[in-house]
From Swiss-Prot:
Disulfide bonds, paired cysteine numbers: none
Protein name: Large ribosomal subunit protein bL20
Alphabetically ordered keywords of this record: Ribonucleoprotein, Ribosomal protein, RNA-binding, rRNA-binding
Database matches in InterPro entries: Ribosomal_bL20 (IPR005813), RIBOSOMAL_L20_CS (IPR049946), Ribosomal_protein_bL20_C (IPR035566)
Length: 115
């Protein structure tokens, strides 16, 4: 049986983890064992929060549309139903942008939906 030398592989793996941990505080960026734990935790959080961001933005858009719609005397749920009936195909992101940046145009969209 020949001898297997793995020093380079281990060093490369540890350097990769420490490179990912750059910017972490204290031993979390210097010691391999703690850095490895923190990198795994950071990657897990990043994976989870990439999905959470989509939910958060959708909630923000709905809140903004609801606030702007109530100023026009209609609730969010009524507005979405009437938009569907009027065959106005604006998604929540577009409606929220209109509500924030161009309230006059949003008011016209609401009036059109009310029909």
């Amino acid at each position: 049986m020949s001898r297997v030398k793995r020093g380079n592989v281990a060093r490369k793996r540890r350097k990769k983890v420490l490179k990912l941990a750059k910017g972490f505080r204290g031993s979390h960026s210097r010691l391999f064992r703690t850095a490895n734990q923190q990198v795994m935790k950071a990657l897990r959080n990043a994976y989870r929060d990439r999905r959470k961001r989509k939910r958060d933005f959708r909630r923000l858009w709905i809140t903004r549309i609801n606030a702007a719609a109530r100023q026009q005397g209609i609730s969010y749920s009524q507005l979405t139903g009437q938009l569907k009936k009027a065959n106005i195909l604006l998604n929540r992101k577009m409606l929220a942008q209109l509500a924030v940046l161009d309230p006059v145009a949003f008011a016209k969209v609401v009036e059109t939906a009310k029909g």
